[in-house]
Amino acid sequence: MSENIAKRYVKALIEVCKKDELNDVLKGLKAIVSAFSVAKFNDIIKSPTVSKKDKISLILSFLKEPNVKIENLLKILMKNGRISLLPQIYDGIKESIALSNNEYQGKIYTKENLDEPTIKLLETNFSKKLNANIKFVCIAGNYTGVKIDISDLGYEISFSIDRLKSAMSEYILKAI
């Protein structure tokens, strides 16, 4: 439910801001959103004893140059008790800008981290193939094989070593 509410604010910001203004808003929100990972900050924001004006002042203190659009957004969110939606609004704006620039984020799941040249090679090849600018993040885990996921475009490619072994065993048994 909160995602739908955040999408409304994102849509409103996109309609109100020009492209360069939207980038400035995104930079400002990035500084603010990073504070939401600090427990003390969340305690202050949720505290009923701290006035809304003081909360807005605290949030604006994270910005080097306060933006009128950000200030108005903060006032509206604070008035409606939805200041906790800021991280989701930030993600929505970031995603919208990326989509308008034809940029997509992908994930590579492997057992070990891939080196930077390999990731760059994959980014280049997928960017050419999909006619978009693709950036990958490597996530090391217990995945035996390689899985590439570009969820925004609906692409998922996986190669499992276990599956290869079973297919080879099956093929050898059929050949005998």
Swiss-Prot record:
Major location (coarse): membrane
Similarity remark: Belongs to the ATPase delta chain family.
Q: Which residues form a coiled coil?
A: none
Q: Which GO terms describe its cellular component?
A: plasma membrane; proton-transporting ATP synthase complex
Q: Source organism's superkingdom?
A: Bacteria
The way it spans or sits in the membrane comes to: Peripheral membrane protein
Q: Give the source species.
A: Campylobacter hominis (strain ATCC BAA-381 / DSM 21671 / CCUG 45161 / LMG 19568 / NCTC 13146 / CH001A)
Q: Name one Pfam family in it.
A: OSCP
**Protein name, please?**
ATP synthase subunit delta
Extract the Gene3D superfamilies matched here.
Answer: N-terminal domain of the delta subunit of the F1F0-ATP synthase
